[in-house]
UniProtKB/Swiss-Prot annotation:
Subcellular location: Cytoplasm
UniProt record, GO biological process: rRNA base methylation
Disulphide bond pairs: none
Annotated keywords: Cytoplasm, Methyltransferase, RNA-binding, rRNA processing, S-adenosyl-L-methionine, Transferase
Any single Gene Ontology cellular-component annotation: cytoplasm
InterPro entries cross-referenced by the UniProt entry: Methyltr_RsmF_N, MeTrfase_RsmB-F_NOP2_cat, MeTrfase_RsmB-F_NOP2_dom, Nol1_Nop2_Fmu_2, Nop2p, RCMT, rRNA_ssu_MeTfrase_F, RsmB/NOL1/NOP2-like_CS
Enzyme Commission code: 2.1.1.178
Gene behind the chain: rsmF
Keyword presence, Oxidoreductase: no
Record's protein name: Ribosomal RNA small subunit methyltransferase F
Annotated residues for binding of S-adenosyl-L-methionine: A123, A124, A125, P126, G127, S128, K129, E147, D174, D192
Role of this protein: Specifically methylates the cytosine at position 1407 (m5C1407) of 16S rRNA.
Assigned protein family: Belongs to the class I-like SAM-binding methyltransferase superfamily. RsmB/NOP family.
Length: 473
């Protein structure tokens, strides 16, 4: 039990009115006061689900499949000595700690093995859904990950970096700008909207601290502006998923109906009744999923899937972006960089990526990003792969974690003690080995970074945001 969880009487009264079965009110309250089951999602950019399950069994982790996400599991693991977030598997990006309900919006967006070349994640931090979508896109196409809060962009980037993702472009704007700045540019848009967080009670005892009916209405007005912008940015025929981790109809069904009332027949609601077995328990008349915590023993959540059937008016805007600071590498330059990368580390450049240059920095952008360059100011695009020096190229961390395979020949395998040192940002000395230049670092056959030989020592190249200081595996 969570005895500290306080449910305001007006909140309980409002829930009693909207529960699909009013007799479930006691079950709803009891569910809100139960601790939340921990869940994870396997990052298939790094490891297959079958391989991960085998490794989990070796660690005596008990996994229970999440029915709406084939890569998701509830997990029962002994964290008395090492938290899940400090395990080698997590730090190597093999899995993401993600609440089970929050896996549902992305599953809805990619339902039926849908394929998209350009996707917008309008409110992306901390990155659970961005990384989930990148894995389903298999690092192909372009995924614009926007976050309004500048401080949260750092966390978003760290998670993208840890998970070996290379097809993202990060931006830092109010989501309301996209309809005017990038009208009809995306095959799919996910808006996991800022909300009152009523569904998060089980993991946050203070979730209801500032709850009020007045604040819900204010938040709903923001959500309506965001869903309009998301719909405007969507191509005709494209798919929009709107989701929240809250329960009120004002922030959920009524926001979707606002879109329908605004754009009429251009808006089509698509049923999620077949998303997973027993989805009918949460299905609304419109085909949305309105999930209360007692239904599937998870967080409260709402998911709606919407199709755009026709163009709609978009705002006229005046953009002042300034000169784009990157230059596209010539075919000759890209070929030279590709040759040097293969010679140094045995790594091939992906065929769907382009090399761009900024001063001495060498970047790899997703090819599908090029039409958006000059249309929006991005805070970070693709991955930095090298710095050019007189003596050649100095390769960067993400060239290993995003492009190298576990069978990489130009690599060194660390033992457990050395791997702990590595993740704490320290140099390592592999026994009986020495070399020159950069070297791919592996642990348990997973690529965990890039170092540089200095005699018999490997200089640590782990980015600062990924360094841990204690309590490691």
């Amino acid at each position: 039990m969570h005895p500290n969880i306080s449910l305001p009487e007006p909140f309980i009264a409002s829930m009693a009115k909207i529960l699909p079965d009013p007799t479930q009110l006691a079950d709803f309250i009891a569910a809100c006061q139960r601790p939340l089951r921990k869940s994870i999602r396997v990052n298939t950019l790094k490891i297959s689900v079958a391989e991960f399950c085998q490794r989990a069994a070796e660690k005596e982790w008990q996994l229970t499949p999440v029915p709406w996400c084939e890569n998701g599991f509830w997990i029962d693991a002994d964290e008395s000595l090492v938290p899940l977030g400090n395990t080698a598997e997590h730090m190597a990006g093999l899995f993401y700690i993600q609440e089970a309900s929050s896996m549902m919006p992305v599953s809805a967006l990619f339902m039926g093995n849908a394929h998209y070349d350009s996707v917008l994640d309008m409110a992306a931090a901390p990155g659970s859904k961005t990384t989930q979508m990148a894995a389903l896109m298999d690092n192909q196409g372009v995924l614009v990950a926007n976050e309004f809060s500048a401080s949260r962009v750092k966390v978003l980037h760290a998670n993208i970096e840890r998970c070996g993702i290379r097809n993202t472009a990060l931006s830092n704007f109010d989501g309301c700008v996209f309809g005017g700045w990038l009208p009809e540019r995306f095959d799919a848009v996910l808006i996991d909207a800022p909300c009152s967080g009523e569904g998060t009670i089980r993991k946050d005892p203070d979730a209801m601290k500032n709850w009020s009916l007045e604040s819900i209405q204010s938040i709903a007005n923001t959500q309506k502006a965001l869903i309009e912008s998301a719909f405007q940015a969507l191509k005709v025929g494209g798919t929009l998923v709107y989701s929240t981790c809250t329960l009120s109809r004002e922030e959920n069904q009524q926001v979707c109906w606002h879109l329908k009332q605004t754009y009429g027949d251009a808006v089509s609601f698509e049923s999620l009744g077949n998303l997973f077995e027993h989805a009918s328990l949460a299905l609304t008349e419109e085909g949305f999923l309105h999930i209360f915590p007692q239904m599937y023993d998870c967080e409260g959540f709402f998911v709606a899937k919407i199709r755009k059937l026709a163009s709609v008016p978009t705002p006229e805007v005046n953009k002042r972006l300034g000169k784009f600071p990157f230059n596209k590498a010539s075919h000759k330059q890209q070929a030279e960089i590709a040759q040097q990368l293969h010679k140094s580390l045995g790594i091939e450049l992906p065929s769907d990526a382009q090399v761009w240059l900024r001063d001495n920095d060498v970047w790899l952008f997703p090819e599908a990003l090029e039409p958006l360059l000059g249309e929006l100011r991005f805070s970070r695009m693709g991955i930095k792969i090298a710095e050019a020096h007189k003596s050649g190229y100095r390769w960067q961390h993400q060239v290993a974690t995003c492009l190298a395979s576990s069978s990489a020949s130009h690599s060194v395998e660390l033992d457990t003690t050395q791997a702990r040192e590595w993740f704490m940002g320290r140099d390592v000395r592999p026994e009986g080995q020495s070399g020159q230049g950069e070297v791919i670092i592996r642990y348990a056959n997973d690529v965990i970074g890039l170092g540089k030989w200095v005699g018999n020592r490997v200089k640590n190249g782990l980015p600062r945001e990924l360094v841990r200081d204690k309590n490691l595996f």
